[in-house]
UniProtKB/Swiss-Prot annotation:
<dbReference type="InterPro" id="IPR001706">
    <property type="entry name" value="Ribosomal_bL35"/>
</dbReference>
<dbReference type="GO" id="GO:0022625">
    <property type="term" value="C:cytosolic large ribosomal subunit"/>
</dbReference>
<protein>
    <recommendedName>
        <fullName>Large ribosomal subunit protein bL35</fullName>
    </recommendedName>
</protein>
<dbReference type="InterPro" id="IPR018265">
    <property type="entry name" value="Ribosomal_bL35_CS"/>
</dbReference>
<dbReference type="InterPro" id="IPR037229">
    <property type="entry name" value="Ribosomal_bL35_sf"/>
</dbReference>
<comment type="similarity">
    <text>Belongs to the bacterial ribosomal protein bL35 family.</text>
</comment>
<dbReference type="GO" id="GO:0006412">
    <property type="term" value="P:translation"/>
</dbReference>
<keyword id="KW-0689">Ribosomal protein</keyword>
<keyword id="KW-0687">Ribonucleoprotein</keyword>
<dbReference type="GO" id="GO:0003735">
    <property type="term" value="F:structural constituent of ribosome"/>
</dbReference>
<dbReference type="InterPro" id="IPR021137">
    <property type="entry name" value="Ribosomal_bL35-like"/>
</dbReference>
<dbReference type="Pfam" id="PF01632">
    <property type="entry name" value="Ribosomal_L35p"/>
</dbReference>
Length: 65
């Protein structure tokens, strides 16, 4: 059986941690930042965990993660 290819965009966006969850950078921190509060921007800086409903999609994109 041939090797499965990973989705290259998913490789760049998601990292698997030791507990098997995937972490990713949060959105809404690229532009139009003047109207967003400092507290909101600070919270967006940190990584977020992929939800249970989306985890299977990420796993299918990253077969060897």
């Amino acid at each position: 059986m041939p090797k499965l290819k990973s989705v290259r965009g998913a490789v760049k966006r998601f990292k698997k941690n030791s507990s098997g969850c995937f972490k990713h950078k949060q959105a809404y921190l690229r532009h139009l930042l003047t109207k967003k509060s400092t507290n909101r921007k600070r919270n967006l800086r940190f990584k977020s965990i992929v939800s249970k409903g989306d985890k299977n999609l990420v796993v299918r994109c990253l077969p060897y993660a």
